[in-house]
Amino acid sequence: VSGALLEAQAVSWRVGPALILDRVDLAVARGEMVGVIGPNGAGKTTLLRLLSGLLPPSAGRICLDGHDISGMDSRARARQLAFMSQDASPSFPFTVMEVLLMGRYPHLGRFEREGPADRERALRTLSYVGLTGIEERQFSELSGGERQLVLFAKTLVQDCDALVLDEPSSSLDIRHQDRIFSMAQELVREGRAVVASVHSLSVAAQYCSRLVLLDRGRVAADGRPEEVLRSAVIDDVYGVKTLVSPNSATGTLTVTVLPRRASGAGMRVHLIGGAGSAVNLSRELYRLGYALSGGIAHEYDSDEKLWKSLGIAHESVGAFSRVTDEDVERATRLVATADVTILCSFPIGPGNIGNLRLAGKSRKLIVLRPGPEDVPRSFFSSEGKAIFDELRAGAQLMSYTEVCAELDRLSDGAGSGSLPAG
């Protein structure tokens, strides 16, 4: 790729008969922070070691600033590219300062020793990563997180245009994790290139401008976080059910692994919500394995967004649209096949009064009693209040906890017949 600072061209890596990487293409430009993600054994560390010139590819080639890396000596390569290993265990009894000064080795002459300027650079960098005053301590005496920060500081002391970081935050708390990735972003803004393998998909989405997803040695997806982190792709590669949603504080994507679902005994439950009132109950009943349906929801409502992300069958209308008689008829098929319909707590006005009429078509109706943190049930017309009172007279009023217990009882076959009125 034209303009790439670091590039893998159809790179493969084989150990005996095992093909660890299979024809991987990757081009990283200046000003780009690329996160390499994937399950354990996908080939992330192998790819990073190939990019760094620490392993020779079985096929293909690695180019650094347009030059085949295999033709560069280690000192010349290290002047342009710094590698941080995820292994922070000490091999020799070095002080922190001695570890940092190893980053200056590529910039020294054959018989040249580090000078005051090199030591000053090391001290400034140590302060930059938040570890002032530990330069004379033994590297082996540091905690795992401190060692990782020192090794990251060493890559900064090396002063390269390309940085390759293998799980740089695996031993760090969230404060120091943010420090490392924020510093990496600063390097990118200066025109450098950063490639990092990242275990957490949410962290990768927050800090990286681009993600490369590896699966069994091949590139499964490559693009912006919102292009790569799609539930259908992640579920297939990782073998789990996930929910990908925007973080309301950062605007970046958060990936959550959904709990493994119980059987739910095949019971079908329809949820009628609004204003996000069905979100918590939907999540819990989904986890318990009930066959859920929902609606009628308004587009962009939290209920509708959750049902869509979980693949729950539901009916919806446009945002701010009135629920019409035709909408109610369309949704009746879901209510008619449900063993139980649950009417959640939400404000009822002209736009959604049709949901009360839909509840009246249920075989068995539970009216959810609002809790202290739930949306209050309020009415903006006497008609809505009258319809609700009629529904309430023939239904069971239950709390969140009581609903879960009642569904469990019914799914065990103890609740044949109609629900008692309350």
PLM ranges: what are they?
Residues 239-312, 317-323, 343, 392-422:
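ABC ATPase nucleotide-binding domains
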